[in-house]
């Protein structure tokens, strides 16, 4: 809209600040949660995918758990693509007793895929994603 409606009266001399987000758009607000359990150590298991036309960049916070022997692994991943190739960096890695897997990414058809090769069977994946539109 083009008007501002106040909940209460404003007195003379008061300062009123109006911030407009008209130039900004929030698409798919919030953090996407994707959780899964991987029962094998097969290479390149897809743990998340998204339409490459919808999103250009995704930041992930990943937590891997192997509860039966108290092993935990967390890290952040920043991923971006140009519709042909995927660029990805992993950082802020915290390993408690074990490295539970390695990450990779690719484009398959219209999807960008985040993949994991776990080092142990029965690895739980908790993934949180912040997506930025294309």
Task: Identify the residue ranges that each predicted region occupies.
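N-terminal assembly/attachment segments of tailed bacteriophage virion structural proteins
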Residues: 1-29, 54-58, 65-69
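Ser/Thr- and Asn-enriched, surface-exposed coil loops between beta-strands
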Residues: 1-4, 41, 110
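Terminal beta-strand-rich extracellular "head" domains
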Residues: 78-98
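Glycine-rich, low-complexity segments
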Residues: 11-49, 130-134
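Beta-sandwich interaction modules
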Residues: 37, 44-51, 97-108
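Subunit-assembly interface segments of extracellular/virion macromolecular structures
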Residues: 42-44, 49-83, 118, 123-134
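Low-complexity intrinsically disordered segments
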Residues: 94-134
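Surface-exposed loop/edge segments in extracytoplasmic proteins
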Residues: 28-34, 70-73, 86-89
């Amino acid at each position: 809209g083009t008007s501002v409606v106040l909940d209460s009266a404003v007195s003379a001399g008061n300062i009123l600040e109006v911030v407009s987000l008209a130039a900004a758009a929030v698409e798919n607000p919030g953090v996407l949660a994707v959780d899964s359990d991987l029962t094998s150590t097969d290479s390149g298991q897809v743990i998340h995918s998204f339409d490459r036309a919808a999103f250009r960049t995704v930041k992930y916070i990943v937590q891997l758990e192997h509860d039966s022997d108290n092993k935990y692994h967390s890290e952040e991943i920043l991923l971006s693509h140009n519709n042909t190739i995927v660029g990805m960096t992993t950082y802020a890695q915290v390993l408690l007793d074990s490295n539970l897997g390695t990450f990779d990414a690719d484009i398959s058809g219209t999807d960008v895929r985040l993949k994991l090769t776990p080092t142990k069977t029965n690895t739980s994946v908790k993934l949180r994603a912040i997506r930025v539109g294309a």
